[in-house]
Amino acid sequence: MNPIYKTQILQGHGRPIKNIKFSTDGTQIYSASADRKVIRWDYQANSKASFTFTHQASVNVICISPDNKTMLTGDSTGCIYIWDIDHTSLIKKIEFDPCLNVRSIEISTDNVYAIVTLAARTKNSKSLVNAYLMSTLTLPQSEEEGKVPPTPIKTFESTELSTKFVQAKFTNYNKSLLISREDGGLEMINFENGNVISCNKFHDDIILDFDVSFENGIILTSSKDGYLSLINLNTFQLVRKFHPENPTRNLNACVISVIDNPYYNMPTVSSNVISVDNLFDLTEDINTLLSTASSPNNQSKFGKGKEIILAIASGGQDSKFVTTTNQKEGGFDILIYNAMNGELLASFLDHFGPVNSLAVHDKTLASGAEDATVRVHKIDHYLFDKK
């Protein structure tokens, strides 16, 4: 399969990349690292860092507000930093229990709420998802006030130790939350009253990352068990599983991307061609649709819809084994699947260590890895043409 040749390398970190995010308009990339830094890259202009935000511990997560004015970052010592992006200044620092680890931060699409996933590093402890008003978080405080964490408007607690929360995101117009768990389960919770709307177990090990496409009604999850799962958001049922060939691979990150179909409006070779437009139509028999998607011609590979959905994932074997195996055995390549029929469309090796985070904006894919670099790729149609 063709590699992606248009790769831009962003170098500036001294330790592994933990999380990367695009700005809302896609013109900038933010990368968080174990070197206690968050770097902003104006990658479209050059490959140099434009600004560095500094923590006092390893930075785990980044979240950019929808209006692109505020950034929330969380670290491994239970601290959250709120930044003014326009003025590149720190608004305030919130300190939770130092035994807590900030696992995820999410801001609602209307910029009203922020949810923070917190978990202790010890095994015999539960985890929390706290919800705050953004107006409260962005309100400047004195140094003394900043030492006391603000009171959350809502708190959701894991019910058992085995179901510790990993990541939380808003869904259904901010009326509910999707929360991934360490036991491989995924649950949807009513944001108002905390009642569980749906719950299902899709993996045999911890869900390391998940992404949601509201327009297409799907959820994509990646796990330590090496599988990538595609889930129907409406029914909360499994649509299909993708299993990379490398059995040692942890799938650390996943994203959903939608691109134009290169075969749209081409003459149809087979009458059994499935369209991405009706893949998740609940009135259709999903098994019939999936079975007709395996026709060998290119039209059936991509469907005849105007757009196709890509399921992108990456990871690699545990970093402690990286020095004992070669780059190919480590499973550090980035995989691009057709979400319609599960076919692997592209696989390319770019990093020299496990990939920890993926982000996508339009046709630009960014990856951050243990090798302390961020790599930016252009998703072009020629990528999917086999030689």
Ranges and model annotations:
Residues 32-35, 74-77, 117-121, 125-126, ...:
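Conserved strand-to-loop turn within each blade of WD40 beta-propeller repeats
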